[in-house]
Amino acid sequence: MKTLYSPRRFYPVETLFNGTLTLAGRDQETTGFAWWAGNARLINLSGKLLGAHVSHAGLIVFWAGSMNLFEVAHFIPEKPMYEQGLILLPHLATLGWGVGPGGEIVDTFPYFVSGVLHLISSAVLGFGGIYHALIGPETLEESFPFFGYTWKDRNKMTTILGIHLILLGAGAFLLVFKALFFGGIYDTWAPGGGDVRKITNLTLSPNIIFGYLLKSPFGGEGWIVSVDNLEDLIGGHFWLGSICIFGGIWHILTKPFAWTRRAFVWSGEAYLSYSLGALSVFGFIACCFVWFNNTAYPSEFYGPTGPEASQAQAFTFLVRDQRLGASVGSAQGPTGLGKYLMRSPTGEIIFGGETMRFWDLRAPWLEPLRGPNGLDLSKLKKDIQPWQERRSAEYMTHAPLGSLNSVGGVATEINAVNFVSPRSWLATSHFVLGFFFFVGHLWHAGRARAAAAGFEKGIDRDLEPVLFMTPLN
């Protein structure tokens, strides 16, 4: 246990794949890292590492801009977004650009502007990345001490952390300002089937906002994923932005406490592992959010959630059979339970049949038909609006269940249908990315801790078995 508090672990430790510590050049012989170790060659070259990061940002923004324009070029306003394989335009529509009542797209010009702005930004980032990778100083410490750093300088590292937190807080406030002052955002709960509106009274009560964090993640509780109104959503961003900005100022002004210095490993690879761990958590949360939440990810743009499509199917057939004369309140199904309606474990009236498992779904097309005890039988008989029928029929046939090489996977679809919901894409991609980032977190954390403890020398490539094998001929 003594090594845990040994001063050795505070020295600049990096785990090499090859056994030399001279880091002047960028080839395998001088850095100890082969080409496939990526930016590890640049660990101690802050100027070149800046070039790599700015170039990476340029590639990301270039993808965003070009994919945005690609989706605009292929967009058909008459079809729902979720039928067209779009993954970027739904985000822009959710922010209230180009959308009219009921989620109808009335103007695609804002989407075009977004794509062009991202392309222009990517050109600037690309130029900066190439400049710093090829022309700019190898290290920033001498010429630009404010931007220079050494990995073991804990005060500088927490200052950089603080700057990042302030930028994240500013990003959260951008959404708050858009919702409050700059045209508002799309609210799927607006009466009559959704509309863009300004958020006038955002929720600032800490009891409500932090109550979400204290909820169980299971069942009808749903942790923060259960947020079902824009007031709470924007209020949460206000709180989060404030906390990030104040936390950022704190980290810039203070030095790490003694317990922090002892608890953490202070090396480039350790910071990489912390970042990957955080991104992994973000990925898993985003996966659950896009899969279950139809407020932050409106079904008008992303397609229905799984429970929503299932409940929509029950609702559609209830409407049909009621028109044909069925008594939906008393009809029995094959199991003796109610065919169309039954009671939940807590006594509410819910849809019967297989969709009973999704009885606590909340959706804007269904909520107007509820009373104090669940679904209201008189409302189901007299108050169903045409837009509710249309929307549920649409959602019933677009469940987020299809696979790439199969039909949609719901009994109501004909064999020719091959539909993959953007909800499926976004949820599965974020789950997979979250998982891989978690593996990366474990890998780099293990290497960083081993290097700090002083018993990991890297992989000795000189004794690699393949070097002693007869060449394949």
UniProtKB/Swiss-Prot annotation:
[CaMn4O5] cluster binds at E367. Binds multiple chlorophylls and provides some of the ligands for the Ca-4Mn-5O cluster of the oxygen-evolving complex. It may also provide a ligand for a Cl- that is required for oxygen evolution. PSII binds additional chlorophylls, carotenoids and specific lipids. Residues 1-14 form a propeptide. It holds the Pfam family PSII. Keywords: Acetylation, Chlorophyll, Chloroplast, Chromophore, Manganese, Membrane, Metal-binding, Phosphoprotein, Photosynthesis, Photosystem II, Plastid, Thylakoid, Transmembrane, Transmembrane helix. InterPro entries: PS_antenna-like, PS_II_antenna-like_sf, PSII_PsbC, PSII_PsbC_sf. The modification N-acetylthreonine is found at T15. This is Photosystem II CP43 reaction center protein. It comes from Gnetum parvifolium.
